[in-house]
Amino acid sequence: MALGNALYPLTATVFLCVVGFATSSNENSRFLINSRLEVNVKSLLGEICGTNSSLLSIGVKSLSNEYSDRTVENLCGNETTEVLLWIPVGNFGNLAELGLSSRYLGKGAGDEDFAEYCSYDVTTKSCTTDNGAVEGSILLLAEKFPERYELRDLVYKKWRNSTHLGAPILAYGTLKNREPAYKYVDQDISYLADTRIEYVLPATVTHGIPLSVYRGKTESYKLVAGETYYSRIFKTINAIRYMSPYSTINVTVIGSEGRDYREFRAKLVTVYTDEEGYGWSKSLSSIEAAMIETKLTETHVEYALPVNLYDTQPPVLSPLLPALNEGNSIVDKGQQPAKGIVAKPENIHIHISELDFGQAYPGFRNVAIGAAILFFSVLGVAIIDMIRRTIANRRAKRLHLGKYSRT
């Protein structure tokens, strides 16, 4: 398979995770050029993990800053959920200067089915097997650990569902009090809560990749990168209102949205009654536009477990990283100890825009404003004309002109 054709499945799989992979730095992204994804991990481990294998003591390159290079023996002895890649050795520059490991697992860049695994020496820059040196381009095995991100600092700004001029109407209903001795009405008002969310994800998340959105440690819903999430939930709010006997109150449920689970917190607003003649409540405020801002912050793996690319069973990970070379008698020269998972200092900003629900009548707001301007303009002209006529009549009466003349 050509290198160019291998780039797309590599990218699609590398970024397959709860929210998607985001590059930690520009330096790491250059490693992925002309890389190949190891799709048959079980077969690979079966070939290199034998008891008599001469490859157990050599290293596997890590592409994640939180993970140090580890040996093939450590790779074979621990459950792995990372992505395994074959990367051209030239992408790493001079490995001898890094001083992490003297040898890495490699293979020739020729026919995938017949490529023989070899031991790449960082000093001599040659990859050898029991049968001699491997000619041509060399690929090194590397691990790419998932980077998990969590939505934090959710800030609610505004929300709108325009059925009247700026009034966020969620539902409306009628309360009737048929009891002559009872001045309170207890009634449930139901409404549909629509939610439309469009995620603007980092450019490194491939379009069409399945994503899962978590609220804390609970999966809220699933969507696909590049698509808009939509849901309609039937909700009920309990209304207890003071009402005079035999009266009727029209109520409107207006809403705001909570920070946690995007639930509407509705309140009742009295519109009018047939007895007391209430007008619009002064507490009904106009809510315009819609924008929810949040930050995408990298957090610990246990918040959202990585996707296991080659096993049907979900992975079980401890909160901390497995110690490299733990319990192994063979340790590479210059091997660095493992580091714990830490949150990235940089925050990736994501804007979650609540799409406009649309008005009950398209263009209602503009039409209403235009009609109001026209109405008051005509009213103003009419009032001015009435004043002018009144003044003219008084003047004619005082001067005995027109119909007020003696002749």
UniProtKB/Swiss-Prot annotation:
Keyword Cell membrane belongs to the record: yes
Cytoplasmic side: 388-407
GO cellular-component term (any): plasma membrane
Major location (coarse): membrane
Keyword rRNA-binding: no
Extracellular topological domain residue ranges: 25-366
TM annotation in the entry: 367-387
Keyword annotations: Cell membrane, Glycoprotein, Membrane, Receptor, Signal, Transmembrane, Transmembrane helix
Entry's localization field: Cell membrane
Biological role: (Microbial infection) Acts as a receptor for ENO/enolase from parasites P.berghei and P.falciparum. The interaction is involved in the invasion of the mosquito midgut by P.berghei ookinete, but is dispensable for P.falciparum ookinete invasion.
Subunit structure comment from the entry: (Microbial infection) Interacts with ENO/enolase from parasites P.berghei and P.falciparum.
Protein name: Enolase-binding protein
Biological source species: Anopheles gambiae (African malaria mosquito)
Lineage: Eukaryota, Metazoa, Ecdysozoa, Arthropoda, Hexapoda
Gene: EBP
